[in-house]
Amino acid sequence: VLSVKSLKTTTRQVDYLTEEQMNNLINLPPIDTSTGIRHRIIMCLLYDTGARVQELCDLKIEDINLGNNPTVKLHGKGSKIRIVPISKNMNQILEVYISKFYSNIKLKNEYLIKNKNNQQMSRDGIEYIVQKYATILKNNDPSFPSKVHPHMFRHSKAMHMLAVDIPIVYIRDFLGHEDISTTMIYARADSRKKNEAINNLAPKLIEENYVDWSKDQDLLDFLNSFK
């Protein structure tokens, strides 16, 4: 029995932004230029859909369903497809973006996000854009992370969903995880939940087990002897 090695477990570090940091980052690109609009759309989609960076690169006009119940079709790992709901704000932003850049209905099979050469946006291109604006924020706010990558938008979305008590099973489906144990890294990283659980137990412990030591003079004399 002693020769059997114990199973090693590791806790993955989850890098994410607060809601305030995320809002500041997303709203940084100017919307009075085509480039600024495109950059804002990229970051809005990364956060709102929780998409992996390659899923965003592969997104086409035909994958966007706008209207009363807007959704985005993401093409994930292993050719797996998942339908993700998007917010009303994201719906409005996409309506404006598509009408401005893709008014021709024949372009349904075109990639939603393109680079300045009118080609499919690459992973490196999106990483560059995200880091560009993160660096600007960092220069103005020392507390802002110096390194921000596209996957942090996905992490941040999961953590923010967890913070408003969205069930972990729904978060798993939203992110497209096969195994819920992958999603559980966010639950383990949420210290707010841990503190909440501890604080919920605290009143009972105090109420049921609290002893007023101030009335026990012998005990007080004993404790004072250690001074």
Predicted regions span which residues?
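Conserved catalytic core of the tyrosine transesterase superfamily
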Residues: 1-227
